[in-house]
Design a protein with these regions (language model features):
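Short, acidic Ser/Thr/Gly-rich low-complexity loop/linker segments typical of extracellular
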Residues: 1, 62-64, 274-295
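Beta-rich interaction/scaffold domains
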Residues: 2-6, 11-269, 276, 311-312, ...
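Amphipathic, non-membrane alpha-helical rod segments
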Residues: 11, 291, 295-298, 303-311
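Disulfide-rich extracellular modules and peptides
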Residues: 35-37, 282, 307
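Extended non-catalytic scaffold regions that mediate assembly and binding
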Residues: 280, 325-327
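Intrinsic-disorder/low-complexity linker and hinge segments
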Residues: 329-333
Length: 348
């Protein structure tokens, strides 16, 4: 029994179909409210950027008429971009989709659109999961009919950086690391490489070639222990696991021969050779006017010649068989004849 008053109610079929409203209860009041029929939200896809241009559609699983589980990377921003497909025969003019509990719920999400953001859905740069309930609402009538669809958002781990090195220098990843890419290639003439993965968020378990490691810690991998693909590249898997989900990055290592490169130069000239990662490489032999370096065939290097501290000559080159380079001595004339500075009154 209810005392006379105004009440709010929400009735459902125990699944996803609801009707709600307010009712003034007096003696003898009877409530008659009809639940919505059919399935208004046929399917939901999710992207993490406008129009899904960069990352495409996120993986989904365990999908039913009332809910679905979506794998959202930890680097996602707070807003998601859902694509709501209406059920057959749904009046999309009068039935619109909203985020339940959204204080700005007066803004409907468009049907079949990848451009309307579902704001404040997840935390940025986080492995924290979230549930978001969406409602397809039919406006008009005495009471509001609506159907719910729950987005279970499971966060997946990612790297913020990935580095490789051998015993000589750092190795250049191709392409440069980005969270849009999961496969990289490096080249080395050595039998071991060191892989250093850095996770974006704490809490992810990391393995490199099956060896457990911490974020930011290098792992030494023997190439002889690695599987090879059809192109004879050695495959090093880097696996991150969190929230029961694993994400795999692959480093493909091209084993190349090393080749001697000779740099001839004037006596007293300071010559250094750097890898593409900026590491200084020591010569295997030096006579004072000729330095020999064992470099990885086909990889790029730069020499920097210095005379009297302030004068330099620089040149980039790929290591080639039988290569001998003559390093020029920098011009030591002073091209800058004067330098002055003064204060400027920047007040308006």
């Amino acid at each position: 029994d209810l005392i006379p008053a105004t009440y709010t109610f929400d009735l459902s079929d125990g699944e996803f179909r609801h009707v709600r409203g307010t009712l003034e209860v007096k003696e003898g009041t009877t409530l008659t409210a009809q639940l919505p029929a059919g399935q208004w939200i046929k399917s939901v896809g999710i992207g993490i950027d406008n129009y899904w241009k960069t990352y495409g559609e996120m993986p989904k699983q365990d999908v039913t008429a009332a809910e679905g589980t979506y794998l959202i990377p930890d680097h996602s921003y707070r807003s998601l971009y859902p694509y709501f497909e209406p059920g057959d025969g749904v009046d999309t003019t009068n039935i619109r989709v909203y985020k339940a509990g959204d204080p700005n719920g007066n803004k409907a999400r468009g049907w079949e659109s990848k451009a309307v953001a579902l704001t404040d859905s997840v935390e940025s740069n986080s492995l924290k999961n979230a549930d978001v309930v969406c409602e397809a609402r039919l406006k008009g009538g005495t009471y509001e009919q609506y159907q719910t669809y729950t987005l279970h958002l499971i966060r997946t781990p990612s790297l913020s950086d990935l580095a490789a090195a051998d015993s000589v220098s750092g190795l250049t990843l191709s392409p440069v690391y980005a969270n849009t890419t999961d496969t990289y290639t490096v080249a080395t003439s050595q039998d071991q490489v060191k892989i250093t993965p850095t996770a974006l968020c704490s809490g992810a378990a990391i393995t490199v070639a099956g060896k457990s490691t911490q974020s930011g810690s290098p792992v030494t991998v023997n190439l002889a222990d690695c599987e090879q693909d059809s192109g004879k590249n050695y495959l090093i898997p880097v696996v991150l696991t969190a929230n029961g989900q694993s994400v795999t990055y692959t480093v493909k290592v091209q084993k190349r021969a090393s080749t001697p490169v000779i740099l001839n130069h004037d006596e007293g000239l300071d010559v250094k050779v750097y890898s593409q990662t900026g590491d200084c490489i020591e010569p295997t032999s030096s006579t004072g006017t000729a330095d020999t370096y064992m470099l990885t065939l086909g990889c790029g290097y730069t020499y920097l010649a210095t005379k009297d501290v302030y004068y330099h000559a620089e040149h980039a080159f790929p290591a080639q068989p039988g290569m001998t380079l003559t390093v020029p001595t920098p011009v030591t004339d002073d091209w800058l004849t004067g330098l002055s500075a003064k204060t400027v009154n920047s007040a308006p």
